[in-house]
Amino acid sequence: MDLSPSLLLMLWTLLSVLVEEITGQKVYTNTWAAHISGGSAEADRLCKKYGFINHGLIFEDHYHFSHRAVMKRSLTPKRTRQVLLKREPQVHWLEQQVAKKRKKRDIYTDPTDPKFMQQWYLLDTNRHDLHVKEAWEQGFTGKGIVVSILDDGIEKNHPDLQANYDPAASYDVNDQDPDPQPRYTQLNDNRHGTRCAGEVAAVANNGICGVGIAYNANIGGVRMLDGEVTDAVEARSLGLNPNHIHIYSASWGPEDDGKTVDGPAKLAEEAFYRGVTQGRGGLGSIYVWASGNGGREHDSCNCDGYTNSIYTLSISSTTQMGNVPWYSEACSSTLATTYSSGNQNEKQIVTTDLRQKCTDSHTGTSASAPLAAGIIALALEANKNLTWRDMQHLVVQTSNPAGLNANDWITNGVGRKVSHSYGYGLLDAGAMVAMAKTWVTVGPQRKYVIDILSEPKDIGKALEVRRKVEPCAGMSNYISTLEHVQARLSLSYNCRGDLAIYLTSPMGTRSCLLAPRPHDYSADGFNDWSFMTTHSWDEDPAGEWVLEIENVSNNNNYGTLTQFVLVLYGTASEGLSRKFDGDGSRNVASSQSCIVCEEGYFLHQKSCIKSCPQGFTSSIQNIHYTLDNNIEPLLVNVCVPCHVSCATCKGTTINDCLTCPAHSHYNLLDYSCTHQTQRSRESPTLKDSSHDYVARTSNLPFIVAILSCLFIIVVFGSIFLFLQLRSGGVLGRKRLYMLDSGIISYKGIPSGAWQEEGFSESETEETAAHSERTAFLKQQSTL
């Protein structure tokens, strides 16, 4: 059989490659590298002379040649052509090129675990997935991140978990020992925690089961559901080793029966708070929570105080086809979604199982939360400085609503799609990791509390409460962009399940805080229950908030709303410039107690002005506002009035005048203004200089003082002279006269005068005669 030359060449090339692979022998190509002096012209001349092709410079005087007559791959070098060319004096070095084995140093290859190809939610080229492969390709697999599963224990010796098991992230709270191994039963009741653990950190490439999303993360477990669950048990679990554990994943909560309203008690609530404020060295523990499986009972996850907490990252479920599962609960506190089980024809979740087995039938929102915990571990590996709130911001900004089917998608005030069934959409691991790498930590959390009701309100068939809110810039509770919003309500109602409650933000986002629950016949109402929504994330809180409470039944129900406290959480990191009008002012609704001005403006009569008017001067005042029983300090640039005697001033006292009003004189010595008399109000003649005028006006107080003193002395002397003349006729006589009307004394005479001179003889006689007359009159009156 005749073979064409091209076919023979191809076969020879393939044979060369095969020999190379088997023996490791060198394979020579039809290219050379040469060091030739004389420039490109000389290199071209030599190539033409010996049949080479010049492919150009490699770098200075070094050229890349090839030869058509030489096979592209050969096991032996072509020495003849090389020797001939090398004899040329301009050729300093020549070498036939050898094919080298080089492999791409990819950091990612698909896991080889036998069940990996069944993990459709990790990698599905036909439909949407969680984009986990994109995160792996960026080099993140959870290394250095610690996740603990709060559940019924973890099978620490499972072959697909053992290599990643972390005893420091584990404990048995039920039996008070360090071993979280589940209690085995015939029904395998305590498999839940082991299944959740495998979703997060099942080991990769070990030939067992599938792979965890964060397959290099450390995984632990807390056995706390296999016994009496108390407030203390929950608190100890939530607070386990908070500076070692980064992420806590919980797929449990109160009964999903459509009638229960329950949440963390005092100790658990304190554990949450301590976790987010002290965990991870102050960055905050991250709590991932399953939103609940009460969909068939028309339950609301806003009646679950764990998923409804601002401290938890609440995760819902969607099916393989992107539909709302039959078990899913809708509520406004859900932040995002991952995949889980659906109808019978839809696939479920692959993970580790009890008794060192593997399962492909993990279901419910119990399966969704650990997938989210794994993705969060990847993001945390990309940036270990993320706070607990940073992580929620990343989830909001990167979650993808595409492909998720629901009839309640809306676009909120900042242009994001959000749903009560899905939150902001499907978690996207690749996008989260990419954003996490360059994420800048958000500003400190701020809290603004407004007590809305001044008196109880009858609910009746429907009740609407409106309130304009304007958080004030410069105050510690000022918020420019929202995160969580809570409506803390207390109300009585004879059938709680007939109520629907909505909250509409100033930017028009309407959150369903409570959907009707047909199985809830309770007459207990709500007692200071916090309904939370994430749907207004990043919106501006300023403006009118509207609370609606509606009786959806035809029954004549009755009840009273006794408390409505609006609690806003967010940041002031957006900057204040966009908050002010063009004139530097920020006006406040009349119901508010404050107004603030941009830097460079001054507060004056509830408006902002560039400079203070005449009669006022600028000042910084520490004003205290009373807000919801809290006294908040605020430093304000204000215009304060001058003293009444000043026209303009530098302060508020009488000695801070800069200029005086008309008909007043300015005193340069004490910077005061003195009001002129009517006589002195004549204008100075034109020939008088302003200096002479000021001098005269400044001497006036001294002249007035001197004249006043002289006047007082004259009056005093006149009175003294008059009294002296009346008492004795001359100044030298110091006598007292006894008259019928009594003793007349001059109080200015020293008391020593009575002792210096006694009575005269005539005065003694007059006194005796007077006494006799007095005695005679008394005797006559007696008769």
Curated annotation (Swiss-Prot):
It is found in: Golgi apparatus, trans-Golgi network membrane; Cell membrane; Secreted; Endosome membrane. It is a single-pass type I membrane protein. SUPFAM superfamilies: Galactose-binding domain-like, Growth factor receptor domain, Protease propeptides/inhibitors, Subtilisin-like. Its main location: Golgi. Ca(2+) 2 binds at D172, D177, D179. The record marks R73, S74 as: Cleavage, second. Disulfide bonds join C209-C358, C301-C331. FU repeats lie at residues 585-618, 636-679. Substrate binds at residues 152, 189-190, 234, 251-256, 262, 290-293, 304, 306, 366. Its cofactor is Ca(2+). Residues 25-105 form a propeptide. Belongs to the peptidase S8 family. Furin subfamily. Ubiquitous endoprotease within constitutive secretory pathways capable of cleavage at the RX(K/R)R consensus motif. This is Furin-1. It comes from Xenopus laevis. The gene is furin.
